[in-house]
Regions:
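Exposed alpha-helical structural elements
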Residues: 5, 59, 88, 172-175, ...
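Short, flexible loop/turn elements at secondary-structure junctions
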Residues: 25, 52-54, 82-84, 125-127, ...
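Radical SAM enzyme [4Fe-4S]-AdoMet core and its adjacent flexible, acidic
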Residues: 1, 70-233, 241-243, 247, ...
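Flexible mid-to-C-terminal extensions adjoining Fe-S/redox cofactors in radical SAM and related proteins
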Residues: 225-230, 243-342
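Residue-level preference for short coil/turn positions at secondary-structure junctions
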Residues: 14-15, 44, 117, 227, ...
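Residue-level signal for well-ordered alpha-helical positions
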Residues: 63, 92-95, 271
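Conserved alpha-helical substructure of the radical SAM core
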Residues: 1-76, 162, 169, 176, ...
Length: 342
């Protein structure tokens, strides 16, 4: 989509807080800072997250600086994809030298963050058959040697071209999540020391949220268990592709193209096509391991926010667990028979 098309789109959208820009590689778009400024000004967006493979270091650094300079109230999160050490990462990403280039990008972004508190820097690791044996060591390596704000660990989702990448056993995934949760707790505590806005209550909800989301992902991956909340894809979030195709979830097929609606978002939002797809999600009882839609559905669920998360937090407090304790004691993650569905 051109900048003019995006300007028309922005002008027809309501105010919203979160904008997540993915790819492809988002930082290959030279006018990315202008795109973000559109939504910052017109729609009052104040939280932007951008994943990157870390390859276009110079352009990434330039754009990040420009975003922070032109959008002074924006919280900008950059998630650098690292799927293993050295050759493992390069092999998974099919790009020789990707790991070293990504490390260079991380170092440059760390330098920017020392003078820009609105920038947060995360690592994102996708768990696959190829890297399952070094994911835990990778997490500890970044914790000990880099000044990061967080590290995400996500089981591979969707239908990859190489289906063997999904061959991670439930036992292996549980062990990885057991090691990942204390790392998440470490970064949450670290953020709370750096940012006064992350008070005790919010910190508690963040920690409970990590436990709950891992439990939900694992149960869905291992047993096909439904979420404890309805999926709100297409109601509280929407996916817009580079070519203006629009879908309620990136794992579902497009339901139209914004150009057919004259780039008028409100026209699309009130359309029969969107309402029909939302109804279809409900009929399909659509549940998956996709953390973006899981997280959005969590925070719009009264049951989760008022019951499930406090329950997880209280369990943590009652058992007297520290941030170093593993996943198996803070959640319901214990092996159980595969559930049959009728």
């Amino acid at each position: 989509m051109s900048l003019d098309e995006l300007s028309k789109l922005s002008s027809t959208m309501p105010q919203f807080h979160d904008l997540w820009i993915s790819g492809g590689e988002p930082f290959l778009r030279k006018d990315l800072a202008d795109v973000i400024q559109l939504f910052y000004v017109h729609n009052h967006v104040r939280d932007v997250r951008i994943p990157t493979n870390g390859l276009p270091t110079e352009q990434t650094v330039r754009i990040v600086r420009e975003i922070l300079e032109t959008c002074s109230e924006l919280q900008l999160e950059i998630d650098v994809s690292i799927d293993g050490f050295g050759q493992t990462h390069d092999r998974i990403r099919a790009a020789q030298g990707n790991f070293e280039k990504a490390m260079e990008t991380i170092a440059q972004l760390e330098n920017i963050r020392t003078v820009s508190p609105n920038l947060t820097l995360y690592i994102n690791t996708v768990i696959t058959q190829e890297n399952k044996n070094e994911v835990t060591k990778l997490g500890e390596h970044f914790k000990q040697n880099y000044d990061l704000d967080g590290h995400y660990f996500q089981i591979i989702r969707g239908d990859p071209k190489d289906t063997s990448l999904q061959a991670v056993s439930t036992k292996e995934l549980m062990q990885i999540y057991q090691a990942a949760l204390p790392l998440n707790f470490h970064y949450t505590s670290k953020l709370s020391r750096k940012h006064s806005r992350l008070d005790g209550l919010r910190r508690a909800f963040w920690k409970a949220g990590y436990s709950f989301s891992y439990d939900t992902q694992f149960s869905n991956y291992a047993y096909g268990t439904k979420w404890k909340m309805p999926c709100t894809a297409g109601q509280t979030s929407i996916v817009i592709d580079y070519n203006a195709d629009i879908r309620v979830c990136e794992l579902r097929k497009p339901i139209g193209n914004l150009r057919h609606y004259g780039m008028d978002f409100n026209h699309f939002w009130t359309s029969f096509e969107r309402r029909r797809e939302v109804d279809q999600v409900k009929l399909d009882k659509c549940f998956c391991t996709h953390i973006c839609f899981m997280y959005d559905s969590m925070r719009h669920s009264k049951r989760v926010m008022l019951w499930e998360l406090p329950k997880v937090y209280l369990k943590h407090k009652i058992l007297g667990l520290s941030d170093k304790d593993g996943f198996n004691r803070t959640s319901a993650l214990t092996p159980r028979p595969i559930e049959t569905k009728t």
